[in-house]
Every structure is written in C-alpha cells, then in structure tokens.
Amino acid sequence: MYRMQLLSCIALSLALITNSAPTSSSTKKTQLQLEHLLLDLQMLLNGINNYKNPKLTRMLTFKFYMPKKATELKHLQCLEEELKPLEEVLNLAQSKNFHLRDTRDIISNINVLVLELKGSETTFTCEYDDDTATIIEFLNGWITFCQSIISTLT
C-alpha cells in the first residue's frame, strides 16, 4: 500500500532533480521518460518478488527473450516485442492473495514510453540471446538497461 506512495514520491523527486539539471530539453525529456520506464519495471518486479506471491514458481517457468547486447534506445524494440507475453504471464499469475494492481495500465505505460524513446524507426531487428530469461531476469535486465542509459545522460 505504501509502496505506491513511495514510488510516486521517488518519481516526483527524480523529476525535480532532472528538471533542475543543466541539460538540453530533449535530453531532459529522454531522461525523465527513462526514469518513468525504470519505475514501472521496478513496480512489476516488486510485485512479482512479493513474499505473498504463491504463483512465483509458476511464473518462473515462462521464458522471455533478451537482446544479445542492449546499449542504445533502439534496442527498446526488443522490450516492446516481449510486452504482450509479459502481460499474459502477469495476468496468469493473478490470484486472490496476489494481485498486481493495474497490470494493464503499467504495461500500457511501458509501451507508450518505449515507443516514444525508441522513435518511429521500425527497421531495427532484434538479435536475441540464445539463452532465455525468467521473468525476474527479464525485468532485472531491462532495469539495468535503463539505469545504464540514464547514467550516460547525466
């Protein structure tokens, strides 16, 4: 219950810090969008890692594809391609004791942010790693990607 308020507080703090930094407006916008994407991914991961999640072991059986090397915003195309399977796994895991609030809204937010960040380029083809990832590895991988890109913008 308080987690959502804490994440909102962090998001607002990051927005204030970002807006006061002496960077170009497009860089500020990109950084802010990445920070929102990061928070959405962390919210999903926190919900999955919740100790009350009785379906975690089932969720871990589903596999996701990760890009071989994600270092640029265009690689977000790979995340976009895995959003539908991610949403389906999250919806399967819903139960009386475990419910990721607003899963559809979070996935929708992620999709909008990814589309804005990667731009309209649709010719990029993802090269996926040979090994698949669990849902936790998948989310952690994209969280690390966001943190890495944010660190290069500051």
UniProtKB/Swiss-Prot annotation:
InterPro entries, sorted: 4_helix_cytokine-like_core, IL-2, IL-2_CS
GO BP of this protein: activated T cell proliferation; adaptive immune response; cell surface receptor signaling pathway via STAT; extrinsic apoptotic signaling pathway in absence of ligand; interleukin-2-mediated signaling pathway; leukocyte activation involved in immune response; negative regulation of B cell apoptotic process; negative regulation of inflammatory response
Location (main, coarse): secreted
Disulfide bonds: 78-126
Signal peptide from the UniProt entry: 1-20
Chain positions carrying an annotated carbohydrate: 23
Pfam (any one): IL2
Key words of the record: Adaptive immunity, Cytokine, Disulfide bond, Glycoprotein, Growth factor, Immunity, Secreted, Signal
Highest taxon of the lineage: Eukaryota
Gene Ontology CC terms, in alphabetical order: extracellular space
Localization per Swiss-Prot or TrEMBL: Secreted
Sample GO molecular function, one term: interleukin-2 receptor binding
Function of the molecule: Cytokine produced by activated CD4-positive helper T-cells and to a lesser extend activated CD8-positive T-cells and natural killer (NK) cells that plays pivotal roles in the immune response and tolerance. Binds to a receptor complex composed of either the high-affinity trimeric IL-2R (IL2RA/CD25, IL2RB/CD122 and IL2RG/CD132) or the low-affinity dimeric IL-2R (IL2RB and IL2RG). Interaction with the receptor leads to oligomerization and conformation changes in the IL-2R subunits resulting in downstream signaling starting with phosphorylation of JAK1 and JAK3.
UniProt similarity note: Belongs to the IL-2 family.
Protein name as it appears in the record: Interleukin-2
Gene name of the encoded protein: IL2
